[in-house]
């Protein structure tokens, strides 16, 4: 599946980063859509920061370097890293490449039974690769690609579809 960049309006919010110290305030273009997906091709790095959203990163072309807790992770193409809310991290891209960056406000799930358990599972980072989690990797990768496809559609059923796919992603 080819990932198409969404219209500038929906993706431009990421370029208007609001940083206070190391805290990045995520602003969403669409008020009732607490999910932001960006197909990032920019070579610029993101210095040490944290935000109240979960962040899912998947390099699509070339790798991506993420540093958390003084440990550096070199993500390969199609490996998935889930960074929990509040986790200080730094992002360093290669000189060329493409990566999917998905920011999710986990309060989306607060009214669901089992949210507390889900939130506690997401209190630390999770690296999903063919080696680390072979039993779920293919499904998780497929779900992220479906989320990207739904996000690019931007029709009246995109948001409910994305929510359903995120529920699957976080409960595997």
Identify the function of each model-found stretch.
Residues 33-123, 154-160:
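N-terminal regulatory/effector-sensing and dimerization cores
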Residues 151-167, 171:
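All-alpha amphipathic helical-bundle segments outside canonical DNA-binding/catalytic cores
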Residues 2-35, 88-152, 171-172:
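A hydrophobic/aromatic-rich effector-binding and dimerization subdomain
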């Amino acid at each position: 599946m080819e990932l198409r960049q969404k219209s500038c309006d929906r993706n431009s919010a990421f370029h208007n980063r609001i940083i206070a110290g190391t805290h990045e305030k995520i602003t969403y273009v669409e008020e009732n859509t607490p999910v932001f997906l960006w197909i990032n091709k920019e070579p610029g790095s993101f210095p040490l920061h944290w935000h109240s959203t979960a962040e899912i990163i998947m390099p699509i072309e070339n790798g991506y370097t993420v540093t958390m807790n003084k440990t550096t992770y070199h993500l390969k193409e199609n490996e998935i890293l889930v960074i929990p809310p509040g986790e200080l991290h730094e992002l360093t891209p290669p000189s060329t490449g493409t990566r999917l960056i998905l920011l999710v406000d986990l309060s989306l799930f607060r009214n669901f039974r089992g949210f507390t358990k889900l939130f506690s599972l997401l209190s630390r980072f999770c690296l999903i690769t063919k080696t680390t989690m072979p039993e779920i990797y293919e499904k998780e990768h497929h779900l992220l690609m479906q989320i990207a496809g739904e996000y690019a559609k931007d029709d009246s059923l995109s948001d409910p579809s994305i929510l359903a796919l995120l529920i699957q992603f976080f409960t595997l």
